[in-house]
């Protein structure tokens, strides 16, 4: 079943907005754990899903398919963001072993 044009347009708009949200994030102190950042991103995704749930059109199957596609696409955008955050955390880790004294 193909998505309705109106739903495709909503998904496209949602992805653009979500991408802007992710690109606006500045990583700085205080740092949050990777797990907490995953929770934050999942909360953002749920917010977008709930917002667009009220706007998608069509039969229940068409609406469900549109929301499923939106969730998959949001995940696709979130994964590189979370990888970037993971790398940021690694670059700010304190050494686990003190440097050898001379």
Curated annotation (Swiss-Prot):
Protein name as annotated: Alpha-hemoglobin-stabilizing protein
Inducers of expression: By GATA1 during erythroid maturation.
The family this protein is said to belong to: Belongs to the AHSP family.
Keyword Cell inner membrane appears in the UniProt entry: no
Pfam family, one: AHSP
Keyword Cytoplasm: yes
Name of the gene encoding the protein in the UniProt record: AHSP
Predominant subcellular localization, coarse grouping: cytoplasm
Lineage summary: Eukaryota, Metazoa, Chordata, Craniata, Vertebrata
């Amino acid at each position: 079943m193909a998505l309705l044009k109106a739903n495709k347009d909503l998904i496209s708009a949602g992805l653009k907005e979500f991408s802007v949200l992710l690109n606006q994030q500045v990583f700085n102190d205080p740092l949050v754990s990777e797990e907490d950042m995953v929770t934050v991103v999942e909360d953002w995704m749920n917010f977008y899903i709930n917002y667009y749930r009220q706007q998608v059109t069509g039969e229940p199957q068409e609406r469900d398919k549109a929301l499923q596609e939106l969730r998959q696409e949001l995940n696709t955008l979130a994964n590189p963001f979370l990888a970037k955050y993971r790398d940021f955390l690694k670059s700010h880790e304190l050494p686990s072993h003190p440097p050898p004294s001379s």
